[in-house]
Regions:
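Acidic, small-residue rich beta-repeat scaffolds with periodic aromatic anchors
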Residues: 4-5, 19-28, 40, 113-173
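Hydrophobic h-region of N-terminal signal peptides that target proteins for export
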Residues: 8-18
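Terminal domain-start segments
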Residues: 17-60, 170-173
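Beta-propeller blade repeat segments, especially FG-GAP/WD-type strand-to-loop junctions
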Residues: 20-26, 78-106, 146-153
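Short Pro/Gly-enriched beta-strand edge/turn motifs at strand-loop
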Residues: 37-40, 73-76, 129
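Short consensus segments that form the blades of beta-propeller domains
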Residues: 44-45, 77-85, 132-139
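Acidic/hydrophobic-patterned starts of short beta strands in beta-sheet-rich repeat architectures
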Residues: 59-73, 116-126
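Repeated scaffold domains used in trafficking and secretory/extracellular systems
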Residues: 106-112
Length: 173
């Protein structure tokens, strides 16, 4: 009897563990953004790989997965880089109760990192509180700055500049 009970408990725990590891479906809007970049890469003669460019985390604490698509982590081998002078596009999609996602943030950045339960973007100049008058972008100071959820507008926004952190040397691409 005890052996049967242990077997039942083991089987139930295995089913629970499998459910915990079930793959998360990528919402249509997120997949469309990835596919658009994939097409651009192919048109330039490159080979596209999304790699680690998609993070899935509940950033706004609403119980639904949010999706962070960071183009700085995309590879477009044998073709020009998909970034520009403002860095690479970072798009955050807010997960919805029906499993879909809505774009809730889009901005250029020089990388992203999730620290705790916050998304930090590598930014520079005015976004770091710097006076940029008379400077070219190459002279701007970089920092990392978190996003925060604006529940009223249902979008992510940069948190106050007082929450910025120094730009880590490890973020060099």
């Amino acid at each position: 009897m005890q052996k049967l009970l242990l077997t039942a408990v083991f089987m139930a725990s295995m089913q629970f563990a499998a459910a915990e590891r079930a793959p998360i479906a990528i919402p249509k809007k997120v997949q469309e953004a990835i596919n658009e970049d994939k097409q651009t890469c192919r048109e330039m003669g490159g080979k596209f790989s999304v790699g680690q460019a998609l993070d899935i985390i509940d950033l706004n604490n609403d119980g639904y997965h949010d999706f962070v698509y960071d183009m700085s982590k995309v590879t477009c081998a044998n073709a020009p880089d998909l970034g520009g002078s403002g860095g690479w596009a970072v798009t955050v999609f807010a997960g919805q109760p029906d499993g879909s996602a809505k774009q809730a943030f889009l901005h250029g950045a020089v990388g992203t990192k999730i620290i705790g339960n916050k998304l930090y973007l590598g930014v520079g100049g005015e976004l770091c509180g710097e006076d940029t008058r008379g400077k070219v972008r190459a002279q701007y100071q970089n920092c990392i700055r978190p996003l925060q959820w604006n529940a009223r507008k249902k979008v992510f926004e940069f948190a106050p500049v007082s929450q910025k952190k120094p730009f880590p040397k490890s973020w060099a691409r």
